[in-house]
Amino acid sequence: ANALYLVNLDTVPVVAFATGHSEAITTSTSTSFTGLLNDNNFEVKEFNMLTDEIPEDASIVVLGMPTTDYTSEELSKLEAYLGDEKMASSRTLYVMTAPNAGWSSMPNLSSFLAEWGMEPQSQEVLESNTNNTLYNMPYAIFANVTDSVLSKTYDNVVKVQAAPVKRLFTANNDISTYSVIETSDTAYLSNDEKVLETPETDTYTILAFAQRYMDNQGKICANVVVDGCAADFYDGSSLLGNSTFGNKDVTLDLIKNLTGTTDTRVGLTVNQTQTNTMDISASSAVTWSIGMMLFTIVVPVAVLVIGLVIFLRRRHL
């Protein structure tokens, strides 16, 4: 049925995955995410950032947790992509990251993101209040979706082993930054050097968003997103494919917001999230079983795999 809508679209939004930097998240390791995009009539492409040009029709360029730094030539490509004043629609750079992603070894890409007011951190966000965790696991956090970009209310959005993203400014010249997904004020950051009995708690941004208007009406924008929870997109996590959690709805709504598409123009398989409820369709026993499988087996394995990929690729540099 979705194919019928493609006939009526002037253009099909394209999400292009960049390769060439030993990315942990690619089209082959994030089939749940790419399947979600395809089901909602987004076209998925892949290109090599070093040897290829960025696809001209790309609405979103994904950097799926790169593990090596970008060259000045590659960053010039990204600058040209985002800075094209003749663009017919909004464009977005979507950067995925995770704890211990090795940003200290990527100074060029870090500086590029800093110009957009965002700095990925290498620590892990943990939760001190068990009421804000799933099954008392401090690394499985019930996160809050702010109304700065998305206007709906989302329930059961869980972020597992996420890294914080520091906003360097709220507004600077023509760039504004926003916190889209964040923790409660009882979260704290991991410290590998020592375990603190009373850690300092605060609210931390997990997904940050920067925007620059490219026209006088604010209808065409250049956007940069830094998402500290790359585990969401890895096939082993299953978070995007499980309707118990709100991750799928948040992700799809954000992608549609970034591309300027709506439910009526793109796709038919849009599951609207219940607002102001905690309505989980499964029984408590079934939900408990799903949760335990996800967060004691599936997600830890997924994160370990991502970590192993990063380690092995860096070892062979």
What are these regions, as identified by a protein language model?
Residues A1-L317:
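Short, surface-exposed patches at the edges or C-terminal ends of soluble domains, predominantly
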